[in-house]
């Protein structure tokens, strides 16, 4: 496969953009390759600068549940552009999308629009702190909630130990307010609560961990978090930036029947444009400025083009049978890849929830970050490069989720499974 123009672009980009990319994982560094530069996309297919076509299972890291360039999304945004691209003022479109989100997501009674998932999570945490009057938060190892300082923190040694920065530039004094528990382990949460009684403002969790591969919650885990938070007066935040409108129309909280106090959203609600949102109980959300004292603002929050794309996307997701069809496509792909690995004699551990799935390069069960980190990342990197040569575009990391869209055809899925079998055989 010729990728000479992508190589030229990457060399040029590295001279003017740090690392040559505007988000680190795009550099393909962890898979020992150089990125292909994408120039256009349609349906399930993306096309690079050298005119190579790939079946895409990244989907812009989750937003493209309808596939690329859905004609109704394109048409609606084109019409909206004719009325102006940004006003910095309230619009009726904001109300329309907010009403749709409130109707869809069980925990959300009021919602505030922002421009990214990181904005959503950092604002939700600030609001939880303001509402409770407490400073500390609990997050989980392996869960990613954006690049805000309080969230770039890893666990210290022992339950009572404060978190330590996971990136240069995060002050140690700031990181001490973030406590880290083990995903799918209620006992680790209870130990932190016991050590920091009445200090914890919120617990933030991906209800389905999607940033260490795809790791579903074990039975009772989310229920246990709900009970702990209720008993301790702690705000439970579900980070559904990835799972919202993805694993069900009402997100993971609808799928599992567990209602948090607050929810963060992003990706799908923007229809491919930059949108985030956070919402929850009315009594909490009313503490936001200008109705309350907790400050949050944004120049492009509620951008009319993004609101338009979001509204049209949610309308399409409401069509009869949408999630049933998506579930079948996803099941066929995930089971097909797992079967291809078995036939090739290569061991993997496969997980899937709805249209999110992951093939972990390990023999053992993956249920938290420690078990995910046991994967053979070198073999995954080889597999990734081989699949790319076969025209299959996967996330360039063992610890990312693959996404299926409604645009993926049975032919796409069959081709992907056949390519996977061939690539597993080479390992």
UniProtKB/Swiss-Prot annotation:
Q: Name one GO biological process term.
A: protoporphyrinogen IX biosynthetic process
Keyword Cytoplasm listed? The answer is: yes
Top-level EC class as recorded in UniProt: isomerase
Q: Where in the cell is it found?
A: Cytoplasm
Q: Name one GO molecular function term.
A: glutamate-1-semialdehyde 2,1-aminomutase activity
Its EC number is 5.4.3.8
The record's annotation in Pfam families points to: Aminotran_3 (PF00202)
> One Gene Ontology cellular component annotation?
cytoplasm
As cofactor, the record names: pyridoxal 5'-phosphate
Question: N6-(pyridoxal phosphate)lysine: which positions carry it?
Answer: 267
UniProt cross-references to PANTHER family, sorted A to Z: GLUTAMATE-1-SEMIALDEHYDE 2,1-AMINOMUTASE, GLUTAMATE-1-SEMIALDEHYDE 2,1-AMINOMUTASE 1, CHLOROPLASTIC-RELATED
Write down what this protein is called: Glutamate-1-semialdehyde 2,1-aminomutase
The gene name reads hemL
């Amino acid at each position: 496969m010729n990728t000479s123009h992508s190589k030229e672009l990457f060399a040029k980009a590295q001279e003017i953009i740090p690392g040559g990319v505007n988000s680190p994982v795009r550099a393909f560094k962890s898979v020992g390759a150089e990125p292909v530069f994408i120039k256009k996309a349609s349906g399930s297919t993306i096309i690079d600068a050298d005119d190579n076509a790939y079946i895409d299972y990244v989907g812009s890291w989750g937003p493209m549940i309808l596939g690329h360039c859905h004609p109704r999304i394109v048409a609606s945004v084109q019409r909206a552009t004719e009325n102006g691209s940004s006003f910095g003022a309230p619009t009726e479109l904001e109300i329309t999308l907010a009403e749709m989100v409130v109707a869809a997501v069980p925990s959300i009674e009021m919602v505030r629009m922002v421009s990214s998932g990181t904005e959503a999570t950092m604002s939700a945490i600030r609001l939880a702190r303001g509402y409770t009057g407490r400073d500390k938060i609990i997050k989980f190892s392996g869960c990613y909630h954006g690049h805000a300082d309080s969230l770039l923190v890893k666990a210290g040694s022992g339950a009572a130990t404060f978190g330590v920065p996971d990136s240069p530039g995060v002050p140690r004094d700031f990181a001490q307010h973030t406590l880290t528990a083990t995903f799918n382990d209620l006992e680790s949460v209870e130990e932190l609560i016991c050590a920091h009684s009445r200090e914890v403002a919120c617990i933030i969790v991906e209800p389905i961990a999607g940033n260490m591969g795809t790791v579903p919650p074990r039975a009772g885990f989310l229920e246990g978090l709900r009970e702990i938070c209720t008993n301790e007066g702690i705000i439970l935040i579900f980070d559904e930036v990835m799972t919202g409108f993805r694993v069900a129309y009402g997100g993971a909280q609808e799928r599992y029947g567990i209602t948090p106090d607050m929810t963060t959203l992003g990706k799908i609600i923007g229809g491919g444009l930059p949108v985030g949102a956070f919402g929850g109980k009315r009594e909490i959300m009313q503490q936001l400025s200008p109705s309350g004292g907790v400050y949050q603002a944004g120049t492009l929050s509620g951008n009319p083009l993004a609101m338009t794309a979001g509204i049209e996307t949610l309308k399409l997701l409401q069509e009869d049978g949408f999630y049933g069809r998506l579930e079948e496509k996803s099941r066929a792909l995930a089971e097909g890849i797992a079967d291809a690995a078995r036939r090739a004699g290569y061991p993997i551990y496969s997980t899937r929830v709805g249209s999110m799935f992951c093939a972990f390069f390990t023999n053992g069960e993956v249920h938290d970050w420690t078990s995910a980190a046991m994967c053979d990342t070198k073999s995954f990197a080889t597999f990734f490069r081989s699949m790319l040569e076969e025209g299959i575009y996967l996330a360039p990391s063992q610890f990312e989720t693959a996404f299926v869209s409604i645009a993926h055809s049975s032919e796409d899925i069959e081709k992907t499974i056949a390519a996977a079998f061939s690539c597993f055989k080479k390992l």
